[in-house]
Amino acid sequence: MAAKDVVFGDSARAKMVEGVNILANAVKVTLGPKGRNVVLERSFGGPTVTKDGVSVAKEIELKDKLQNMGAQMVKEVASKTSDNAGDGTTTATVLAQSIVREGMKYVASGMNPMDLKRGIDKAVFAAIEELRKISKPCTTNKEIAQVGAISANSDSSIGDRIAEAMDKVGKEGVITVEDGKSLQDELDVVEGMQFDRGYLSPYFINNPDKQVAVLENPFVLLHDKKVSNIRDLLPILEQVAKAGRPLLIIAEDVEGEALATLVVNNIRGILKTVAVKAPGFGDRRKAMLEDIAILTGGQVIAEETGLTLEKATLAELGQAKRIEVAKENTTIIDGAGEAANIEARVKQVRTQIEEATSDYDREKLQERVAKLAGGVAVIKVGAATEVEMKEKKARVEDALHATRAAVEEGIVAGGGVALIRARTAIAGLKGANADQDAGIKIVLRAMEEPLRQIVTNGGEEASVVVAAVAAGTGNYGYNAATGEYVDLVDAGVVDPTKVTRTALQNAASVAGLLLTTDAAVCELPKEDAPMAGGMPGGMGGMGMDM
């Protein structure tokens, strides 16, 4: 085991804070409508240009072990916020940096870090309750478009595309983002279905960039039992191989010898297959397999219907134009099922919804209707160059997450103003002692920081703008894109409540951990072994007396 270095107290914290600052300073320049770009080096190909906070954070690894620990903890803030809310990564990083910076001053002056953390947690809880109160539901297409535009760095065309896609497939529908072929963004709505089961082995992946398995014009085999013996599958595999098309196997499970054989065939390019588990459990699994069968124009191979795997033919298999299998979900696009059969199935499920007695059953049945009838919307991102395409695609994906979050929990005024307004709930808050009061003050100061950074990135004086916004009420705030003080919700500058809430929660959580850290353990760099001794130089012993 390698030797470890243990650093205590202020020495450990100071180094970790340096790491926090390096990462946060690189990320925060991207905040707001006038945020700057960050260029990321790639080991091959040209550099990537981005204004996405989490993309910048993920690239940062520092040489100093302690600094790197601090940076990685704040990277966690950005990643968690991105995973939970899809946006707000830069805001979360700015909040975390501010809480750490202010908190360290109090720790250095001798205050109790645990009480500071309790004060911080108390203030954050009050602020989140206030955010929920001032939140308003996001229902209209216009509001959805505004959220999408803000999240895509004030690009209204992206917001409009997302609103249009949600309008076409419904709020619950599946929306995916792909590379376009032209300079313009395009929207395609394709009949399709997505369920929450992914590939059973990563060896099925054939698109390493997106970490997905893509099958073009495949057959779909549906089976309600486990498949472990390859002999059961051989007859149908031979028929599919002759047809020269890929195959998706959806069964209760595919394991052992059967899975190994499919993987080997896939790697050798003999037969392109992907195996996934059937979605749902029990009776619901049977119903969902039946849904997929109707959508793809196939049949479920089950003993109840008198069909067995050994005797299955291509006629019993479903078909689709394209299927994408990711780690955790499978999307079937343009199934070959008859429209009339799909319509009849939807009608049948809607009848079951009306008769359902439990909320859970009703919710699951509604999900099935959305999957059968909703389809999949594909936003094709257009750009002039590949670098621009990648950057724009990342923004569209961010905006898509943000709009989903807005539909889920509502919207608040954007531009850092919601956090300024939520401070009113903290202003009168009192802790159990002076140290907890200091923790509350830390959060009060931190909640100004996103607005300050947005204004600074826009080239204006932050203190003046913060004072002017704090003096106002409601949605009155500073629109950094135009440099005017307006009602931000009317101007379309809005943030999803979930994004603002998640950013504050995650920032406080990780910053609290950093403040209460009193020792850090890291590996010492390995010392290079000394070089083996060699023969002395020159021609020893060959001297000549003159």
Swiss-Prot record:
One of its GO terms (cellular component) is cytoplasm. It comes from the Bacteria. PROSITE patterns: CHAPERONINS_CPN60 (PS00296). It holds the Pfam family Cpn60_TCP1. ATP binds at residues 30-33, 51, 87-91, 415, 479-481, 495. GO terms for molecular function: ATP binding; ATP-dependent protein folding chaperone; isomerase activity; unfolded protein binding. InterPro entries: Chaperonin_Cpn60_CS (IPR018370), Cpn60/GroEL (IPR001844), Cpn60/GroEL/TCP-1 (IPR002423), GroEL-like_apical_dom_sf (IPR027409), GROEL-like_equatorial_sf (IPR027413), TCP-1-like_intermed_sf (IPR027410). Its main location: cytoplasm. Its EC number is 5.6.1.7. Gene3D superfamilies: GroEL, GroEL-like equatorial domain, TCP-1-like chaperonin intermediate domain. The keyword Nucleotide-binding applies. GO terms for biological process: protein refolding. Keywords: ATP-binding, Chaperone, Cytoplasm, Isomerase, Nucleotide-binding. It catalyses: ATP + H2O + a folded polypeptide = ADP + phosphate + an unfolded polypeptide. It is found in: Cytoplasm. Together with its co-chaperonin GroES, plays an essential role in assisting protein folding. The GroEL-GroES system forms a nano-cage that allows encapsulation of the non-native substrate proteins and provides a physical environment optimized to promote and accelerate protein folding. Belongs to the chaperonin (HSP60) family. Forms a cylinder of 14 subunits composed of two heptameric rings stacked back-to-back. Interacts with the co-chaperonin GroES. PANTHER family: 60 KDA HEAT SHOCK PROTEIN, MITOCHONDRIAL. This is Chaperonin GroEL 1.
